[in-house]
Amino acid sequence: MASDFLPVRRALLSVSDKTGLIDLARALVARNVELLSTGGTAKAIREAGLPVKDVAELTGFPEMMDGRVKTLHPLVHGGLLGRAGVDEAVMAEHGIVPIDLLVLNLYPFESVTVKADCTLADAVENIDIGGPAMLRSAAKNFARVAVAADPAQYADLLVELEANDGQLSAAKRFALSVAAFNRVAQYDAAISNYLSAVADSAEAVPTRSPFPAQINSNFVKVMDLRYGENPHQSGAFYRDLYPVPGTLATFQQLQGKELSYNNLADADAAWECVRQFDAPACVIVKHANPCGVAVGAGCGDAYELAYATDPTSAFGGILAFNKTLDAATAKAILDRQFVEVLIAPDYEAGALEYATKKANVRVLKIPHGNGLNNYDTKRIGSGLLMQSADNRGMSQGELSVVTQRAPNEAELGDLLFAWRVAKYVKSNAIVYAKDNRTIGVGAGQMSRVVSAKIAALKAEEAKLTVAGSVMASDAFFPFRDGIDAAAAAGIKAVIQPGGSMRDGEVIAAADEHGIAMVFTGVRHFRH
């Protein structure tokens, strides 16, 4: 059993990132801690006017092989691994002095290899060998030794030393040990991922496979959740170690109840949909499907139009905006309906003040960022499906008009709007839209024609006029029945991928009804 508090009398410092190094070293020296160090770290400490002993002086071995061998020595690892009450005799026999604190961060492999022009030689030279070995030695012996693997840990470390007369508690040593082992695991995973991706490349700047022979993922827990998708399931939320700027995982919760599994899944769908629009937009999501989407002159206008698509489904929904949410819109929302989550890149002070009247509403702030997710993954039984993320946009110039009548400018704008929305609706997906707002959404049906009929039914329930609207379909129409259903509802233009064996039949149906139709050549299945 580890002693609760143990003094720090000797520390070994060896860091690539020298953030906070001198302040830490100065504080340790002030407590009469003997400093051992290597290479550039020792040089920096010495230049700050602080006493430090080179590890080479301790071991009697110089640094060699351009610094590849510095600390791989029994006098170093024995000093870290020696057990109190067990190994004192053998340590004394071999002249091994105990090291109580290791401060070490690793060669910057991740930041070097993220550069597009990184050569294989550059990558290999930034694979740390002695560093992970020392981290593991110190972390294994947390019963006696403390280890700091990140400059962010220095402040808390010094606070505990100050509060306990130069001693560290067993709880602190254990927590630091876990963090060190996690850091080594992350580091080794980064090396494995990189080398697995370039395994067969002989180029100086190797080509990297998007799907390497082995993948190692690192996620850190953000929070426990009340439960999973259902109350009998447990759940937690983990964030990617390096989250993409602007994605959901970068959120800050400003108020409200704890988030649920379903809250986060729906919030991701809403946020990814709304952030693709440049003009002020609102997306309302229920069960991971947009039930109302609109672009307007401002947030308030966009919300009113999105809400009108399906007021019933909007109850208890997730609302996302791509612009700063103003106080008037926040009041209009919260006075009208029950909301699970509000999402925006920022909020006016008045909006946040009014939101406090509904203390249970979860208010999330997600800073703007242009980053896109690179991959989508899905767990299956004992396996993982991995694909490049569906980041494919669509411009007017990419559309192919396939009918006798071409869409007019207003219809083209609505077609592209509906296409953006359809990308985030579960397949089979049909979206009716007009004037940059959804009129009806048909989602998740096994038959495409049924989705088309549901979209018309939802519009009718909301007392919205389908006549003159456009229709987007996430995949091709296998038969003409979907076009016939759209015509019966009053649809005037259609956007779809094309590619069916019966495209000719579908195009003929559109011509019969005087419908303009464009092909994108891109499918947006979503399961």
From Swiss-Prot:
This protein's UniProt keywords: Hydrolase, Multifunctional enzyme, Purine biosynthesis, Transferase
UniProt keyword annotation of Magnesium present: no
Entry GO MF terms: IMP cyclohydrolase activity; phosphoribosylaminoimidazolecarboxamide formyltransferase activity
Listed GO biological process terms: 'de novo' IMP biosynthetic process
Catalytic activity: (6R)-10-formyltetrahydrofolate + 5-amino-1-(5-phospho-beta-D-ribosyl)imidazole-4-carboxamide = 5-formamido-1-(5-phospho-D-ribosyl)imidazole-4-carboxamide + (6S)-5,6,7,8-tetrahydrofolate; IMP + H2O = 5-formamido-1-(5-phospho-D-ribosyl)imidazole-4-carboxamide
Metabolic or biological pathway, per its Swiss-Prot or TrEMBL entry: Purine metabolism; IMP biosynthesis via de novo pathway; 5-formamido-1-(5-phospho-D-ribosyl)imidazole-4-carboxamide from 5-amino-1-(5-phospho-D-ribosyl)imidazole-4-carboxamide (10-formyl THF route): step 1/1; Purine metabolism; IMP biosynthesis via de novo pathway; IMP from 5-formamido-1-(5-phospho-D-ribosyl)imidazole-4-carboxamide: step 1/1
Name this protein carries in UniProt: Bifunctional purine biosynthesis protein PurH
Organism: Xanthomonas axonopodis pv. citri (strain 306)
Gene name as annotated: purH
